[in-house]
Amino acid sequence: SLKEYADKCISLDGDGDRVILVDEKGNVLDGDDLLYILAFSNPNRTGPWSGVVGTHMSNFGLEQGIQKLGYDFIRADVGDKYVSEMLTKKGWMLGGETSGHIICKDLASTGDGTVAALKVISSLLLLEKRPSEVLSNYTKIPQVNKAVKVTNKDIINDKELKSYIKEIESDITVGRILIRPSGTEPKIRIMVEAPNIKVAEKFAKDIEKIIRSKV
């Protein structure tokens, strides 16, 4: 993006159902950022456009930003399948994942990276704004993600682990903690959001240490 003096660059995954963008400053825009741009650009915020679906991994800052725009925000389980199901259940049109699965129900029934990219670009053209200008209207909460390889995913039910998570949840004024088994790998995934990155990193490291001690 910087080398070519481009306003934006598009990157799709191998099968084309996920997309990320890079803005004119070289910042990588994930699915949360793209969802915000699409929500921001939509003047109709009633009926099928009254809400947005994210997942449990969506940044808390996105939830706050979407709600400030006047939308409802609901979290589905991780996976574009679950986002699509929640959209159908609510009768809404827009949802997606941090990983870049973006679903625009008015254009496609499932995640399509090319469709999502074109929708974002057309939205920015209509706004006559660059990505960074739109995204300056919301702030992400510092987030740390880790994955620990395990032989038994039931570790997430360990009493010591649950006790520690409950303890630190009471210390975090803004943010979230999510511990979940991977749906595709023998791993436990850790996500910690906190007011600053150092706090998030410390808590994530402590949780990882407890899990590793149980393996």
PLM regions: where:
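Short, structured secondary-structure boundary patches
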Residues: 1-4, 32, 93-99
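Short, acidic/small-residue loops that bind anionic groups at enzyme active sites
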Residues: 28-48, 77-78
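Generic hydrophobic alpha-helical segments
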Residues: 1-2, 39, 83, 164
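Short Gly/Thr/Asp-enriched flexible loops that form oxyanion-binding sites at enzyme active sites
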Residues: 18-34, 62-63
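Short glycine/threonine-rich catalytic loop with a Thr-x-Gly-x-Asp
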Residues: 12-14, 28-35, 108-111
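N-terminal small/polar loop signature for handling phosphorylated ligands or for N-terminal nucleophile
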Residues: 1-22
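Phosphate-binding and adjacent anionic-ligand microenvironments
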Residues: 22, 44-215
